[in-house]
Amino acid sequence: MKLVLFNDYRLGVLQNGNVVDVMASLDGLHFHKPQEMVEGVILGWDQVKPKIEQEIQGKEGVPISDVTLRAPIPRPPKLICAAVNYLEFGQRKPAILDAFLKAPTAIISTGETCELPPVPASIFHHEPELAFVIGKTATKVNQKDALSHVFGYFNFLDMSARGLQGAVGNSFFLGKCWDS
């Protein structure tokens, strides 16, 4: 099932190129902000999923081209990114895994304008990435159990201000964590 947030942060299901509004299936879920709605859906998935499945039966929805897609996780409480672009630098073996935190305020929706920071970057670069949504508390998880913590996934663009990392050692913060 492909969940989307669209227009004024309404929950929908993408099927056959159309978006079906499923807000009615969230009856009883209390939230004030889109992020709270998303968290409620994830945490209550076992109860919400059957309601959504029933809601989409026989509904055509509207073409995806007629809606404005929003960020699927509007303000993630934690966004951890892996810094392992070894293929980009011509290395044959993966580099040692490094990670960095990205600010939730760096998240924008499809079609929104990414504001470039006023820094002396050598180039601003977008990198397509795969994001995993962790759906339950995950601390010291064994590799064999890791996927049981994944609620879903989506693609995103990681924006980088290249040429700044060397100025502060090997930190990715200055090059990747600007508000947008």
Give the residues covered by each predicted segment.
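N-terminal non-catalytic cap/leader segment that marks the start of a structured domain
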Residues: M1-L97
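Glycine-enriched loop-and-adjacent helix/strand subsegments that border the catalytic/binding cleft
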Residues: R70, P76-S180
